[in-house]
């Protein structure tokens, strides 16, 4: 929101300079983004009148003028502006004047004609805008007056960021209210008097969508002069607020928008068939907008229509066929209150963002429309002439938002602020904010003003009291707290411990958005329906993630595009799965996920550059599971996943319950996502591994351990994990360790089979094992493997 400092000071003028005013606005919660002067630094420019203007004898594009600047004689000035003409009031840079850029005006000869000054354009005075030619001043501009004084150019444009809860400050009225409250000053609003109707012409108005449009005002104004020039004072105020002048009617509605914060619209009465109807769009209804584009309206879009078709998208954008044109004689002024929920997200859906939608989405004052209508009518009649008709006000009292009644307790105020503000100051602040205040036994009861949608609960009032009282007026007090030692269960595995482990193994933590691109997500989870946002930040962030892989794979592509070959990332966060059995139909699961790509290790002269494979990711995952003490209860089962390579993926089971997936990204998906080389991912349900087995103390055997190695031949489809589990089961009393140390395929082993070299570690806690006992245990393992897996000892 941009506004002119001088315009603000017309309403409330605290005795502080510009810098202090800006600081005060910032401390009030309206962050100031920038302050710029409305014009460049210049001197010696005055109002003049062109007395004569003739064509230069030696130049087609130059004119020779005689200009009256209030001196003893007329000045001879050569000008090249196409709009220069006799009788025009202009800005004249006198001899000795210094213009922006340290440009000094001296006597010159242009094609043989003397020039004793310069007729200036806005740009030559450092004034932004799209004006062509020299400045055209009103006929009543006093000759000889300094142009800085006449145009009030000693002014600043202040640009503020208005947070969504302070929609009342999207107009000068709201900003002035805040400044007045902070400085304990009265607010001097321009007088807005009721315009007396001169004609009886009205327009039938029917509101079908009452909940979406609780209030709609319309007024016919006939016989206006649409070609009337917008006054310079209005053009200047619009320019300093960042709006360009279009025509008198549009300028007036924009002026009221900036002044009061109330969007308005004007229709050409001759193009309206019958009357006005406020309704929702019909099936396949289309509308040609002011910019010439055609849109197909969705059924939940509120429209302003006549008895035939839609005229405009309510609160968003007007229709091109019904706007003011050079032939317009009669207009219909529209002023309405639309429910923010009826407007929110609609403009973005059509790729639009307008000043009107920006305000209606956040909420405008539902009591402001009659004043705005009278203000716009008075300006229209004063500038364009015409005869106004009566105002037609269609209001549904039951659908109008009602101001909140809020109880403020003294003890809550003191506790949250940490400082005792006197009772009379609290009452005064709330009253100056526009609240209707009454005292209660516990504190105060306040009825919020109609323009403050954000005042709803007790904490809102406390925030307002602290803001107006002044954060800098609240003394610094050391924080006092009653510390309670947190309960810590030994069985709880801290997520921070797992993160530290992954960092130690070369990973970096990533934080990605919960909003993801639905096109990417459907590639990873084609069989799951995501939660689609009705009002997304952007189209590629319009779905809630079903897993953390979507964001992590995007991070891998981002890094690979920046020449980062070795990528190891992990993330913990929520996934959002539609589930009718869950609260609000969405199940939120805390997940732990990781991704690796590129070489196994950083480049080193003593190591080969080998790419990562399935077992690198599996090893990292097993290191995590080792922390839980449940690694022996974990099973990796070959199982397909649409995003993973069918031969290099596995589901992770804990006590026969699926808790995650691990695998290589499918080659086809790898190409679609623009991944560079083999990429591996894993993901776990954190709550399933957040509990660890509490370590139990066991005696360490004083007796020697014995190792025996066996090599068994089994079919290729036999899982090594099943072999190891069977050995542990058979030798449970004496077998303390089973380890695979070699896998062989080749000569001596039939095709379709593999040789597994396994070490068996045997030990007893009470005695030294005899050779016969060791041999018997090994034989039992071999027999069990032969019976279950048709394994045979390799020669």
Curated annotation (Swiss-Prot):
Annotated Mg(2+) binding sites: 454, 460, 463-464
GO molecular function: ATP binding; magnesium ion binding; phenylalanine-tRNA ligase activity; tRNA binding
Cofactor: Mg(2+)
Entry keyword annotation includes Transmembrane helix: no
Enzyme Commission (EC) number: 6.1.1.20
Reaction catalysed by this enzyme: tRNA(Phe) + L-phenylalanine + ATP = L-phenylalanyl-tRNA(Phe) + AMP + diphosphate + H(+)
Cofactor notes: Binds 2 magnesium ions per tetramer.
GO annotations of cellular component type: phenylalanine-tRNA ligase complex
Cross-referenced Gene3D superfamilies: 3.30.56.10, Bira Bifunctional Protein, Domain 2, Ferrodoxin-fold anticodon-binding domain, Nucleic acid-binding proteins, Phenylalanyl-trna Synthetase, Chain B, domain 3
Record-annotated tRNA-binding domain positions: 39-148
UniProt-listed SUPFAM superfamilies: Anticodon-binding domain of PheRS (SSF54991), Class II aaRS and biotin synthetases (SSF55681), Nucleic acid-binding proteins (SSF50249), PheT/TilS domain (SSF56037), Putative DNA-binding domain (SSF46955)
Pfam families: B3_4, B5, FDX-ACB, tRNA_bind, tRNA_synthFbeta
Keywords noted in UniProt: Aminoacyl-tRNA synthetase, ATP-binding, Cytoplasm, Ligase, Magnesium, Metal-binding, Nucleotide-binding, Protein biosynthesis, RNA-binding, tRNA-binding
Domain B5 residues, every copy: 401-476
Example GO biological process: phenylalanyl-tRNA aminoacylation
Localization terms from the record: Cytoplasm
Superkingdom, natural source: Bacteria
Ranges where the FDX-ACB domain occurs: 701-794
Subunit structure of this chain's protein: Tetramer of two alpha and two beta subunits.
HAMAP family for the chain: Phe_tRNA_synth_beta1
Family: Belongs to the phenylalanyl-tRNA synthetase beta subunit family. Type 1 subfamily.
Protein name as it appears in the record: Phenylalanine--tRNA ligase beta subunit
Organism, as annotated: Sodalis glossinidius (strain morsitans)
């Amino acid at each position: 929101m941009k506004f002119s400092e001088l315009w603000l000071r017309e309403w409330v003028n605290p005795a502080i300079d510009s810098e202090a005013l800006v600081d005060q606005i910032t401390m009030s919660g309206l962050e100031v983004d920038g302050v710029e002067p409305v014009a460049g630094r210049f001197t010696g420019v005055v109002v003049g009148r062109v007395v004569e203007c003739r064509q230069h004898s030696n130049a087609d594009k130059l004119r020779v003028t005689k200009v009256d600047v209030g001196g003893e004689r007329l000045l001879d000035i050569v000008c090249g502006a196409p709009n220069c003409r006799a009788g025009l009031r202009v800005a004249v840079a006198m001899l000795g004047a210094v213009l922006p850029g340290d440009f000094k005006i001296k006597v010159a000869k242009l094609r043989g004609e003397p020039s004793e000054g310069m007729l200036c354009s806005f740009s030559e005075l450092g004034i932004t805008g799209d004006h062509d030619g020299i400045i055209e001043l009103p006929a009543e501009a006093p000759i000889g007056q300094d142009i800085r004084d006449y145009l009030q150019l000693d002014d600043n444009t202040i640009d503020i960021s208005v947070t969504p809860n302070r929609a009342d400050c999207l107009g000068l009225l709201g900003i002035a209210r805040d400044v007045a409250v902070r400085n304990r000053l009265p607010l001097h609003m321009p007088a807005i008097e009721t315009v007396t109707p001169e004609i009886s012409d009205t327009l039938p108005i029917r509101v079908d969508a009452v909940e979406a449009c609780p209030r709609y005002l319309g007024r016919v104004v006939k016989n206006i002069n649409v070609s009337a020039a917008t006054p310079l004072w209005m053009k200047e105020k619009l320019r300093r607020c960042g709006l360009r002048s279009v025509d008198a009617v549009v300028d007036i509605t924009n002026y009221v928008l900036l002044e009061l914060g109330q969007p308005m619209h004007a229709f050409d009465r001759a193009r309206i068939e019958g009357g006005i109807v406020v309704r929702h769009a019909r099936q396949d209804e289309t509308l040609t907008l002011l910019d010439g584009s055609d849109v197909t309206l969705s059924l939940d879009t509120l429209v302003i229509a006549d008895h035939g078709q839609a005229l405009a998208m309510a609160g968003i954008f007007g229709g091109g066929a019904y706007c003011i044109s050079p032939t317009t004689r009669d207009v219909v002024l529209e002023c309405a209150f639309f429910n923010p929920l009826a407007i929110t997200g609609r403009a973005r859906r059509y790729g639009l963002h307008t000043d009107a939608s920006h305000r209606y989405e956040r909420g405008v004052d539902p009591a402001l429309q009659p004043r705005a209508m009278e203000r716009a009518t008075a300006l229209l009649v004063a500038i364009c002439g015409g005869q106004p008709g009566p105002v037609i006000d269609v209001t549904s009292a039951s659908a109008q938002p009602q101001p909140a009644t809020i109880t403020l307790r003294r003890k809550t105020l003191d506790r949250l602020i940490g400082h005792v503000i006197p009772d009379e100051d609290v009452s005064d602040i709330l009253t100056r904010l526009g609240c209707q205040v009454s005292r209660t036994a516990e504190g105060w009861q306040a009825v919020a003003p109609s323009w403050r949608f954000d005042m709803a609960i007790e904490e809102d009032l406390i925030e307002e009291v602290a803001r107006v009282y002044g954060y800098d007026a609240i003394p610094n007090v050391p924080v006092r707290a009653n510390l309670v030692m947190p309960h810590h269960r030994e069985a709880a595995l801290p997520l921070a411990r797992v993160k530290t482990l992954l960092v130690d193994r070369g990973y970096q933590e990533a934080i990605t958005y919960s909003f993801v691109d639905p096109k990417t997500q459907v590639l990873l989870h084609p069989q799951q329906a995501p939660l689609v946002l009705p009002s997304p930040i952007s189209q590629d962030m319009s779905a809630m993630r079903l897993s953390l892989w979507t964001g992590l794979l995007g991070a891998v592509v981002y890094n690979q595009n920046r020449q980062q070959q070795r990528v190891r990332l992990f993330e913990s966060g929520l996934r959002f799965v539609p589930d009718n059995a869950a609260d609000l139909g969405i199940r939120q699961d805390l997940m732990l996920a990781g991704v690796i790509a590129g070489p196994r290790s950083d480049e080193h002269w003593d190591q080969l550059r080998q790419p990562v494979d399935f077992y690198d990711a599996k090893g990292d995952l097993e290191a995590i599971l080792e922390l839980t003490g449940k690694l022996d209860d974990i099973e990796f089962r070959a199982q397909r996943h649409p995003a993973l390579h069918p031969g290099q993926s596995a589901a992770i089971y804990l006590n026969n319950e699926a808790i995650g997936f691990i695998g290589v990204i499918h080659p086809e998906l790898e190409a679609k996502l623009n991944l560079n080389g083999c990429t591996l991912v894993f993901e776990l349900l954190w709550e399933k591994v957040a509990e660890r087995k509490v370590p139990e103390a066991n005696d360490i055997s004083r007796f020697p351990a014995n190792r025996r190695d066996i090599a068994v031949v089994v079919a290729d489809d036999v899982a090594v994990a099943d072999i190891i589990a069977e050995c542990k089961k058979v030798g449970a009393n004496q077998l303390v360790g089973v380890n695979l140390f070699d896998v062989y395929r080749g000569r001596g082993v039939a095709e379709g089979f593999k040789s597994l070299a396994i070490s068996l570690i045997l030990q007893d806690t009470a005695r030294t094992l005899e050779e016969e006992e060791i041999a018997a245990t090994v034989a039992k393992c071999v027999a069990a493997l032969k019976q279950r897996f048709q394994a045979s000892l390799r020669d």
